[in-house]
Amino acid sequence: MAFLVERCGEMVVSMEMGPHGGGGAAAGKPVPAPFLTKTYQLVDDPCTDHIVSWGEDDTTFVVWRPPEFARDLLPNYFKHNNFSSFVRQLNTYGFRKIVADRWEFANEFFRKGAKHLLAEIHRRKSSQPPPPPMPHQPYHHHHHLNPFSLPPPPPAYHHHHLIQEEPATTAHCTVAGDGGEGGDFLAALSEDNRQLRRRNSLLLSELAHMKKLYNDIIYFLQNHVAPVTTTTTTPSSTAMAAAQHHLPAAASCRLMELDSPDHSPPPPPPKTPATDGGDTVKLFGVSLHGRKKRAHRDDDDGVHDQGSEV
């Protein structure tokens, strides 16, 4: 007796084979996806009703406290603690949000006490199937990819995310336990490729701007800045010629300063009272009373000579 397990989408089917490898008779019941089973256990736990619980009619469930739900409950069932990734997974399985003011979700096969209906919930298929070689290309050539020569990502991977609360860069680590590793890896690779293309375009635009600025500077220097002319005269001769050119003007300025009325002579020495009570003659501020006495002495000598001659 042997068992063969096949994965059909997200549904695991077990078939019993015959003793000789032929097709067995009985086919086992379909098993729901692990994500649905874990979500049902998470919602049905009465100890966490203050965080997540069933709705009023037991056909919906409500996440009352998303921060605590992501921090305390998600790591116990999944390999992440991202509430946005959990919401995206619900969307891929056909869950819809009931009201806009709270996180209440519903699916016609997700009901309290009806765990056997979980096998009827299937993962949504993308509207445009990817090309056949694409699912195997990342695993075979991902070490030789050139980020600047990758083809644009197929549009099929951009239409299956209907609820967007977070960038798609974290999608590759959100559904590690439900069989969607290949699609998530392709989505993450496409997002990285798109970011690289955006950065490349920004760098090219910045390079073009710098080239234009460089050309403008060269044009300005060539058309608005005069070239420096070289002379054969030495700096010493040039300085002497400039000094000779300015020397007469400096001399005239100096003479004007001497002849100007603003230039006052030094103050005269203090006057001494005259002994004979007469006016004294001064020359450059010096009294000449001694010369007057000498003149009187000459007069006396002349009178004396005349008397002797008589």
UniProtKB/Swiss-Prot annotation:
Which domain of life does this protein belong to? Eukaryota
This protein's major location comes to nucleus
What ranges does the record give for the region Disordered, renumbered to this chain?
Answer: 124-147, 257-310
| GO annotation, cellular component aspect | nucleus
- Compartment annotation: Nucleus
Q: Which UniProt keywords apply?
A: Activator, DNA-binding, Nucleus, Phosphoprotein, Stress response, Transcription, Transcription regulation
* Compositionally biased residues, Pro residues: 263-272
Q: Where is this region: Hydrophobic repeat HR-A/B?
A: 196-225
What is said about the domains? The hydrophobic-rich region (HR-A/B) corresponds to the oligomerization domain.
The record's annotation in PANTHER family points to: HEAT SHOCK TRANSCRIPTION FACTOR (PTHR10015), HEAT STRESS TRANSCRIPTION FACTOR B-4B (PTHR10015:SF304)
What interactions and quaternary structure are annotated? Homotrimer.
**Protein name from the UniProt record:** Heat stress transcription factor B-4b
Annotated source species:
Oryza sativa subsp. japonica (Rice)
